[in-house]
Amino acid sequence: MIGLFSNSSVQYVKAHKITREKTDVQVQITVTIKLKKIMDVQNLQVKLVSNLRGFNQIDKRWVKSYVELWGIPDQVAILLKRFTGEESPTIADPRDHRRMFADEFSVNDQKSILDFLKNNKAMIVNDILKGRGKLAAEWMLVVQKIDRDARWVLKPMNFAINHFGNGDIVITTQGSFRIGKITVQRKGGDGGRDTAKMLQFKINPAELFDV
């Protein structure tokens, strides 16, 4: 970003931490060009990785929030709630008494969910990675630290969207959904609290080091 300007023109750089938005850090760069001060603002999403396969949450919400955001049909919303455990399983002997895995749904129900994801793929991937509005993230910064070694990579968010969103929409062998390189799963954990029933999207941001 600063590389867009000559070092001599940059007066100062400020970084502001943003909470509850896709942008984690907003960088303000003040430059002087032909005696005029210009402020350039860039929004960064920061991902910290501590292992080689650093799967990282990029979004999690209650299903009802995604219904409001994406206009998910009622029937698909009910299926997603069974997937996360907000609604009880409707089959005999589910693998987990708390919820249903994607491959435990009927063929027609699987198709309903997959069709919704396919028809709305661009919007979904854009929203969970970039976000909307003035605080939409424009860059993805990945910082990986393993033992004493550290490295970082900075990519335009549109590059990250194309990379992680590229690929088929499928049901995984673990019974979750996958949109390209994005895993869609029940959040789980949280010591059994209700928040374990949220829908979660995850990526491996370390992939950006190799593309």
Where are the predicted features?
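Short, positively charged
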Residues: 1-23, 27-211
